[in-house]
Amino acid sequence: MAAGEISTPQEYISHHLHHLQVGTGFWSINVDSMFFSIALGILFLVIFHRVAKRATSGVPGKLQTAVELIIGFVDGTVRDMFHGKSKLIAPLALTIFVWVFLMNLMDLLPIDLLPQAWAGIYSLLGYDPAHAYLRAVPTADVNITLSMALGVFILVLFYSIKMKGLGGFVKELTMQPFNHPVFIPINLILEGVSLLSKPISLGLRLFGNMYAGELIFILIAGLLPWWSQWLLNVPWAIFHILIITLQAFIFMVLTVVYLSMASEEH
């Protein structure tokens, strides 16, 4: 369903908020989010692998310079925030920052560019283009952001048990903040809520900001005439560059902070 074929702004907005899915109900899979998140992850690996293979001690090219700046920035951030010893944290932080940034960056593409291209392919395959749904911003899908946050949560549990031992981890859950056996149920509730709130807030924060940004672009395109859209699109896109970068940075920083807290022995 191309923009020009949609009769009302409500239909336009609804169409652009619908995922390309397989399955129904709880077990449905958002194929578009999966595709773009995996594709952008592969793009990150290819670019950084290529730069690493061609790295030179001489005058670096523009791409190598950009990659070195990103690596230096992330490494410095990790050194300031993570006080334990692990060779995994810096590469993990780099992967999270660049991957989330690339997924966020998809929000700056013209809102109809990829959906209209997909509608054309859908039509050529003999299907009704009115059902050619496509959303290109993976981080505007709560399933993607919460899945990433779940991965961080698993790492937090791993580091907590690794550094404190299973007994120390259980003691931390049951004997804090009130160090008395009678308060174990209360401690367990308080610490459990605190532990679970970290990945949930981490995922929902990224999703909320990116979903809101995508929705604003859709509203501008769906409610305003084409000749006036640039008056709002350009300023919002410029401001949104800051948002997508900041959200990638926040997700990375909170991941490092949570892992640093998990690795500290009490």
UniProtKB/Swiss-Prot annotation:
Q: Which key words tag this protein in UniProt?
A: ATP synthesis, Cell inner membrane, Cell membrane, CF(0), Hydrogen ion transport, Ion transport, Membrane, Transmembrane, Transmembrane helix, Transport
TM ranges are: 28-48, 88-108, 141-161, 206-226, 237-257
Q: Which GO terms describe its molecular function?
A: proton-transporting ATP synthase activity, rotational mechanism
Q: Where would you say this protein principally sits, based on its record?
A: membrane
Membrane topology per the entry is: Multi-pass membrane protein
Q: Where in the cell is it found?
A: Cell inner membrane
A GO term from the CC aspect: plasma membrane
Which HAMAP family does the UniProt entry name for this protein? ATP_synth_a_bact
Q: Return the similarity comment.
A: Belongs to the ATPase A chain family.
Cross-referenced NCBIfam families, in alphabetical order? Answer: ATP_synt_6_or_A, PRK05815.1-1
Note the subunit structure: F-type ATPases have 2 components, CF(1) - the catalytic core - and CF(0) - the membrane proton channel. CF(1) has five subunits: alpha(3), beta(3), gamma(1), delta(1), epsilon(1). CF(0) has three main subunits: a(1), b(2) and c(9-12). The alpha and beta chains form an alternating ring which encloses part of the gamma chain. CF(1) is attached to CF(0) by a central stalk formed by the gamma and epsilon chains, while a peripheral stalk is formed by the delta and b chains.
Q: What is this protein called?
A: ATP synthase subunit a
Taxonomic lineage from the root: Bacteria, Pseudomonadati, Pseudomonadota, Gammaproteobacteria, Enterobacterales
